[in-house]
């Protein structure tokens, strides 16, 4: 074949490449194409397998629930008259792909027209918004006297397969009150619902024992979806013999004999125990996440500062002295980012994923749901995949939920030039996908692979239409979005010169369309977004890197670096215009800077929020005090003090009435454990290097200190007598000390031959006995002199504290959760149990049933390290991994 100029195509190819090389290139291209096609087919097959597995689980749970309900109806039918048959109320399955709930269809939650989004309601928005209409269901009407069933769309899971819910997950109470509520209530998540609290009562033992093999298949839905670590249910039966005097519990395949006090010899662990009657609210959040995320604070026109901690988004009033808070409870896992809509009313927040098919288990059955609000709240709790929520800051109500993400949301941004109709979302997955959404419709308009490495932020340009700027580890790019086709065209920005930075760390926009970046070399660069080239640079202005940039109200740029300096720059000449502000060393370096008039708000790498005036930089105060290291302990002291410690060696004593830190001290080593004496005047600290210190709190003086060895201190505990205390190490061994009136240290007993390191200690109320729990779930007893005691001899001993998690008071909780209790506190007739999945359970004290009801508190995203009562109506909790500290009010 010839081309127009007379040259054959074969001759041209032979001139450019030898024939052998051309064949090799062609073969390589064919192999690459085949690999791409094969990878695509494997991905599609994986999605099909996951979808089919979900369908199998759905069918199993549905079948089991039908059999269980049929059996219950037969029992009821036998106990009633022959004419009073209950089969007419049995729900009928309409479709295998729909989720059904026996509730009135008059106000069904609206089904989104897009499979990867869920709209709870959109009220009071513009003309494009969707409204809830009480229209009839779109499926075939139910028969045989049923009150009606409503199909509720719950979006897609992280892998794209539909998350279908069947009636076995949520038992709907068929009462007149429910039907009345369902016709008059709007199903929406609002602040008045208090979605952080759930009262749980497990099913009766007749239901549990009727068919164990079938009921085990019912447990397919997680009770606590706001976690990455789902609780494991203990399937072994707890059998208590009246004459034995010991309660055998099973933890991790091991049997633990727990002594039973006098008066409980005839208890039946299989009988029900009601939950305590109380109203629980989250009163205050003492923590802020700032060390590992960007775009974590926003300012509202109302004077409220928006930030997040664990699963919660907090709106704090910083204009008054009370520092009051409002809290949005919509998320079920760690919040990773927030952004403010141009109308200054709406907020979009993204969370990470804790959704896994393998971990999708339901540890307990719950009591029937008796209102549409409870149903919607329960569905929201089970929304465990990564998603974005758009919500109203006035009513704290959710407007839209965007689904279809994998690992987590690392950044969200509203468009600026079109009144915020578009939302850019970056998925923190291996593919690092950036998608553009018409969020009011819940529709994904476009998607592109953002980069090959971690993405830090994406922002819409405030003046250039449809331009997105994105940066991260080893990349900095401009994306032009075409609304007509949904195509995103990428242009990579390149640094000129030899000293190219490894990472762009921060970015903001100037007044004249400029894009300003800060990088790991400590350089501030000004870019032309049209040519994607630098126009001006200031080198090495922040040694260690420029971690934060923001445009001030005056048109100048504020920058913060790893040198803990905050500087102001003139964009015209890129020179400093005032003396830099230096942050204290213990506060960390700036990660985000926000200016509100002359006021300056700085979020630092130590999870601290600073507030001050740019004109008076010496007067910086802390809105939130934090630590870069994980929290290690929390306990209450006196009636108004709270003590926290961390791995970075910081000890803080808070006044929880004024919400301020009264005393703070930094130690070289990590503080592993803490305790305070009965007079609230002395505190003992155990460190990771084997050192312990006894301090006087009021005088802030060290009374005694000693190094036990090189092994970490694992537990410390004061006796109620005050002068006696115990110290346990990881060796393992245990030593009991006493400080006399002359402040001399006396050794009372040294206890060796301990099977595993002690992690919790309790003294008896008379200071004569000591009990301990080891890492291997051993329950051990000693006298004050160090002699080993039999459990029978101490069964009636009154214990002065409750740090041991497998004592009689909460042993059945440890059994039913298979040892997933991580913290325990007691106050009069109630017990608080912190769980490995981040939830807190409030039980009646003592817990005498494996099916005991409890009130569940949600908010923490990870394992609970400590819970502590200040009084019967005030509870504190902390989680080490997300550094969250919460105050709860129990009424």
UniProtKB/Swiss-Prot annotation:
Biased composition (Polar residues): 77-88, 118-131
SUPFAM superfamilies with a match to the protein in the record: Quinoprotein alcohol dehydrogenase-like
One protein family per Pfam: Beta-prop_EML_2
Keywords annotated in UniProt: Cytoplasm, Cytoskeleton, Microtubule, Repeat, WD repeat
Repeat (WD) residue spans along the chain: 330-401, 404-447, 499-537, 541-579, 626-664, 708-747, 753-792, 816-853, 859-890
Subcellular localization(s) per the UniProt record: Cytoplasm, Cytoskeleton
InterPro entries for this protein: Beta-prop_EML-like_2nd, Beta-prop_EML_1st, Elp-1-like_TD, HELP, Quinoprotein_ADH-like_sf, WD40/YVTN_repeat-like_dom_sf, WD40_rpt, WD_repeat_EMAP
Comp. bias regions, Low complexity: 104-117
GO CC terms in record: cytoplasm; dendrite; microtubule; neuromuscular junction; neuronal cell body
Function: May modify the assembly dynamics of microtubules, such that microtubules are slightly longer, but more dynamic.
PANTHER family reported for this sequence: ECHINODERM MICROTUBULE-ASSOCIATED PROTEIN-LIKE 2, WD-40 REPEAT PROTEIN
UniProt-recorded name of the protein: Echinoderm microtubule-associated protein-like elp-1
Lineage, top ranks: Eukaryota, Metazoa, Ecdysozoa, Nematoda, Chromadorea
């Amino acid at each position: 074949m010839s081309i127009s100029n007379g040259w054959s195509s074969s001759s041209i190819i032979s001139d450019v490449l030898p024939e052998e090389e051309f064949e090799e290139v062609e073969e390589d291209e064919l192999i690459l194409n085949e690999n791409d096609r094969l990878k695509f087919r494997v991905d599609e097959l994986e999605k099909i397998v996951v979808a089919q597995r979900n369908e199998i689980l759905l069918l199993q749970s549905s079948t089991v629930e039908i059999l269980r309900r049929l059996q219950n109806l037969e029992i009821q039918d036998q106990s009633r008259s022959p004419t009073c048959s209950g089969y007419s109320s049995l729900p009928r399955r309409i479709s295998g792909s729909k989720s059904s709930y026996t509730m009135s269809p008059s106000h069904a939650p609206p089904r989104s027209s897009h499979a990867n989004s869920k709209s709870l309601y959109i009220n009071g928005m513009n003309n494009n918004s969707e409204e809830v209409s009480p229209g009839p269901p779109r499926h075939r009407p139910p028969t045989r006297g049923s009150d009606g069933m409503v199909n509720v769309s719950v979006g897609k899971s992280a892998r794209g397969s539909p998350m279908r819910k069947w009636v076995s997950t949520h038992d709907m109470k068929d009462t007149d009150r429910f039907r009345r509520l369902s016709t008059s209530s709007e199903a929406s998540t609002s602040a008045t619902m208090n979605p952080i609290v759930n009262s749980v009562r497990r099913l009766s033992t007749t239901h549990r024992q009727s068919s164990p093999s079938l009921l085990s298949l019912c447990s397919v839905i997680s009770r606590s979806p706001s976690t990455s670590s789902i609780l494991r249910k203990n399937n072994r039966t707890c059998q208590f013999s009246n004459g034995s005097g010991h309660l055998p519990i099973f933890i991790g395949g091991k049997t633990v004999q727990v002594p039973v006090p006098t008066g409980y010899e005839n208890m039946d662990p299989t009988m029900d125990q009601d939950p305590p009657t109380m109203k629980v609210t989250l009163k205050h959040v003492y923590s802020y996440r700032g060390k590992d995320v960007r775009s974590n604070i926003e300012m509202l026109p109302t004077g409220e500062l928006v930030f997040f901690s664990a699963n919660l988004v907090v709106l704090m009033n910083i204009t008054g002295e009370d520092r009051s808070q409002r809290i949005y409870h919509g998320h079920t896992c760690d919040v990773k980012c927030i952004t403010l809509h141009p109308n200054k009313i709406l907020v979009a927040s993204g969370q990470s994923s804790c959704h896994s098919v393998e971990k999708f288990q339901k540890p307990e059955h719950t009591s029937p749901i008796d209102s549409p609000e409870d149903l919607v709240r329960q569905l929201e709790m089970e929304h465990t995949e990564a998603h974005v929520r758009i919500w109203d800051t006035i009513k704290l109500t959710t407007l839209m939920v965007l689904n279809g993400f994998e690992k987590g949301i690392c950044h969200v941004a509203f468009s600026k030039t079109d009144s915020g109709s578009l939302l850019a979302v970056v998925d923190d997955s291996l593919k690092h996908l950036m998608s553009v959404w018409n969020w009011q419709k819940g529709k994904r308009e476009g998607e592109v692979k953002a980069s090959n490495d971690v993405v830090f932020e994406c922002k819409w340009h405030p003046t250039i239409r449809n331009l997105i700027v994105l940066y991260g580890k080893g990349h900095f790019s401009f994306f032009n979005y075409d609304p007509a086709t949904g195509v995103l065209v990428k242009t990579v920005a390149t640094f000129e010169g030899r000293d190219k930075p490894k990472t762009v760390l921060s970015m903001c926009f100037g007044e004249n369309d400029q894009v300003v970046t800060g990088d790991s070399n400590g350089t501030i660069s000004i870019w032309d977004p049209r040519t994607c080239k630098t126009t001006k640079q200031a080198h090495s202005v922040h040694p260690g890197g420029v971690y934060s940039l923001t445009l001030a109200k005056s048109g100048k740029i504020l920058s913060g670096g790893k040198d803990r300096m905050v500087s102001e720059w003139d964009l015209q000449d890129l020179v400093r215009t005032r003396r830099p502000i230096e942050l204290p060393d213990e506060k960390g370096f700036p990660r985000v800077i926000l200016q509100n008039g002359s006021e300056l708000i700085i979020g630092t790498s130590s999870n601290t929020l600073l507030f001050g005036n740019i004109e008076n930089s010496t007067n910086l105060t802390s809105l939130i005090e934090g630590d870069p290291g994980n929290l290690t302990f929390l306990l209450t002291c006196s009636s108004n003090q709270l003590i926290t410690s961390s791995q970075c060696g910081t000890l803080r004593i808070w006044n929880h009435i004024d919400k301020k830190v009264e005393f703070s001290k930094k130690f070289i080593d990590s503080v592993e454990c803490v305790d305070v004496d009965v007079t609230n005047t002395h505190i003992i600290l155990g460190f990771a290097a084997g050192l312990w210190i006894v301090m006087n709190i009021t005088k802030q003086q060290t009374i005694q200190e000693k190094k036990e060895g090189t092994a970490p201190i694992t537990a410390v505990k004061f006796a109620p007598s005050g002068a006696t205390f115990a110290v346990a190490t990881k060796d393992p061994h245990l030593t009991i000390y006493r400080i006399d009136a002359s402040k001399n240290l006396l050794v009372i007993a040294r206890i060796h031959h301990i099977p595993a390191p002690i992690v919790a200690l309790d003294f008896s109320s008379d200071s004569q006995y000591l009990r301990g729990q080891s890492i291997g779930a051993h329950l051990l007893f000693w006298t004050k002199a160090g002699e080993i005691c039999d459990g029978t001899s101490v069964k009636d001993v009154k214990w002065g504290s409750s740090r041991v998690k497998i004592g009689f008071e909460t042993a059945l909780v440890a059994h039913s959760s298979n040892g997933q209790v991580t913290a325990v506190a007691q106050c009069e007739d109630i017990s608080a149990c912190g769980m490995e999945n981040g939830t807190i359970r409030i039980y009646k004290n003592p817990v005498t049933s494996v099916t005991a009801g409890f009130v569940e508190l949600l908010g923490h995203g990870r394992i609970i390290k400590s819970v502590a009562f200040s009084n019967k109506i005030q509870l504190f909790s902390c989680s080490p991994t997300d550094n969250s500290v919460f105050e709860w009010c129990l009424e």
